């Protein structure tokens, strides 16, 4: 029997983070949920993993869609517990995250590889004990001037960026659908 896909969006819980660059993974998950069957799927608290989860389908493929409720830098244990609980093969985990190295709106998916300094990915790799999972980087651009990356990712998107977020999140969801409906 084929393992389901586990689609994880990275972000931080709390109203102060809702519209920040660091939460673009959560935003992409919200778009993805509108495409599931039954539509839209609803996230509920999975108590064993402290994660918001929906067991649903994209097309005919069973998927587990999740938003960890831990701060991004310590999401690894939640992702590991989810993968173990739902018996998900590591290479069928897809993590959506904010990528400083990509221009705003660019999308790049890759199987395996490094964490590129992203503490959420670092935590997941450490908890899973492997780099063999799919990373979906969603470009948020570089900080202006000498602004520290840590400050930049916790700032809200500009008005122009906010107007483009629906398209960016739709593009990320399109890529997830391609991955889950074809074998990489």
UniProtKB/Swiss-Prot annotation:
PROSITE patterns: PEPT_TRNA_HYDROL_1, PEPT_TRNA_HYDROL_2. NCBIfam families: pth. This is Peptidyl-tRNA hydrolase. The active site is at 22 (proton acceptor). It comes from Corynebacterium diphtheriae (strain ATCC 700971 / NCTC 13129 / Biotype gravis). Its EC number is 3.1.1.29. Belongs to the PTH family. Hydrolyzes ribosome-free peptidyl-tRNAs (with 1 or more amino acids incorporated), which drop off the ribosome during protein synthesis, or as a result of ribosome stalling. Catalyzes the release of premature peptidyl moieties from peptidyl-tRNA molecules trapped in stalled 50S ribosomal subunits, and thus maintains levels of free tRNAs and 50S ribosomes. The lineage of its organism: Bacteria, Bacillati, Actinomycetota, Actinomycetes, Mycobacteriales. Keywords: Cytoplasm, Hydrolase, RNA-binding, tRNA-binding. Gene3D superfamilies: Peptidyl-tRNA hydrolase. It holds the Pfam family Pept_tRNA_hydro. Monomer. It is found in: Cytoplasm. The record marks 12 as: Discriminates between blocked and unblocked aminoacyl-tRNA. GO terms for biological process: protein quality control for misfolded or incompletely synthesized proteins; rescue of stalled ribosome. GO terms for molecular function: peptidyl-tRNA hydrolase activity; tRNA binding. TRNA binds at residues 17, 71, 73, 119. The record marks 98 as: Stabilizes the basic form of H active site to accept a proton. Its main location: cytoplasm. It catalyses: an N-acyl-L-alpha-aminoacyl-tRNA + H2O = an N-acyl-L-amino acid + a tRNA + H(+). InterPro entries: Pept_tRNA_hydro (IPR001328), Pept_tRNA_hydro_CS (IPR018171), Pept_tRNA_hydro_sf (IPR036416).
